[in-house]
Regions:
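Small-residue-biased structural context
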Residues: 1-168
Length: 168
């Protein structure tokens, strides 16, 4: 298997671990509210994990794998377009989660606990199916269609995507 795909599969396993933590945190907010010991800290940690891991994973797919695979399949429709749309939906949910966590950290009460739970549950409901689509459709498609020179292009674009966000 191509090393980039191995990396993407590992990122999916990491995201699944994050989803377990998210489910635990949402459950605690529902049971204890944010006044429970460590609840706000856990939500802040999750916010950073989502920002760091999941969104960087999307960026690497969108800026490295999708453009090269798009040479073979129409990126305006089909699996690439569908996955890009799901990435956009996830980003909106992630923003709602961040907004709610920030409001709770600022001590606001009016419905923010419910909003953080709703956003967390929506993320948890969407991401597993998204991962399945990538692993069962997109990644096998890429493995079957891309030649070695194209994988070189994916690796180069991947490095550029990483370099664009890493501090110098």
């Amino acid at each position: 298997m191509e090393s980039i795909l191995t990396e993407l599969f590992q990122r999916h396993r990491d995201a699944e671990g994050m989803l377990a933590k998210l489910a635990t945190a949402v459950g605690r907010v529902r049971r204890e509210g944010v006044s429970g010991a460590g609840v706000l800290d856990d939500l802040g940690d999750l916010r950073r994990e989502i920002q760091g891991e999941v969104l960087s994973h999307f960026r690497e797919e969108e800026q490295a794998l999708f453009p090269v695979l798009g040479r073979h399949i129409d990126s305006a429709s089909g699996p690439i377009a569908m996955l890009m749309e799901e990435h956009a939906i996830f980003r909106q949910l992630e923003l709602q989660f961040e907004e709610a966590v920030a409001a709770l950290e600022a001590g606001l009460k009016d419905g923010w606990e419910e909003k953080v739970c709703d956003a967390g549950e929506a993320i948890a409901g969407m991401l597993p199916e998204h991962i399945e689509k990538e692993e069962s459709v997109l990644f096998p498609m890429a493995e079957g269609m891309l030649g070695e020179e194209e994988w070189d292009d994916v690796r180069r674009l991947w490095k550029e995507a990483l370099a664009a966000v890493l501090p110098t």
